[in-house]
């Protein structure tokens, strides 16, 4: 008998233990702004990142931590971060790597809000994006690379076109040119696709959609695979390899990366937490974190039904004379059907376009 936790058990219990005083089983809502310290040494260790723990709810809170721990476990990552929205998750992920004068290579098949961020808003901050000509062709990604390229980005299953990205092939090109691959896995969820297993380095989600599932709360998740070593490229990623004067001269790649005292490469996710979330403030409330956690517990059951319904609707639409085309990778007629069967054998999501 296997002792490994199933998807469902992890989604319900990871990152939280019964309360030691009351023995309460459910995840508490830690509706607090601040925390006490055991002594001055404990406080100093937390603020210097010698020890990880709660300082202020803008950057960490036990209710938030339980949810990103569950999400990280389901994705197969090393650590995560819960923020105010999916849009905030993408923005922090991009700004955690790229700075003014830098460049991003992206799939053109994106959620409209993400396209606006890359095409209109980030250029105002000095960050430009090239949308590849053909996201299905790895060489199209390679051709878009510039000397100042800092990351690749795409959606595992795109909203709303429902095309499936060949994560494995795109990740191979990204790593050959020395940049990380960020994947938005909102449509697929970790129940259908685990992008880190196909070579992605970082995964983002709008937890508002399928993870929350009830339309009551807005949140976003970042999960770090810990696989990209920024120390290997000191000139390309100076923000990871030079001292951060706002954090006591901390060098993220050296002090928090591969070979650090934490036993995992946490340079990306801790930089996102203690630098960007600290300064930009896109924090999620503990109450919203609790509501999203309630949804996560039933994710697998809901996604199975969503996929079942989407297949039926797509198949019916395909038979209608008045419907010119149906975009759904779960249809055998889809150009992404074979890739969808490989990367997402449980189903290619519940979104379709016609």
Regions found by a protein language model. Name each.
Residues 34, 39-91, 113-121:
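Conserved N-terminal alpha-helix of the aminotransferase class I/II PLP-enzyme fold
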Residues 50, 74-75, 215, 346-348:
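Short glycine-enriched loop/turn motifs at secondary-structure junctions
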Residues 37, 136-140, 334-335:
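A short acidic, often aromatic-flanked loop/helix-cap motif at beta-alpha or helix-coil junctions
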Residues 322:
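Hard-cation-handling environments
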Residues 26, 311, 327-353:
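Conserved glycine-rich beta-strand-loop-beta hairpin in the small C-terminal domain of fold type I
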Residues 13, 30-32, 57, 327-329, ...:
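Residues in well-ordered beta-strands of folded domains
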Residues 1-54:
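N-terminal glycine-rich, Lys/His-bearing helix-loop that initiates the first secondary-structure elements
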Residues 2-3, 13-20, 80-319, 327:
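Conserved PLP-enzyme active-site core in the AAT-like
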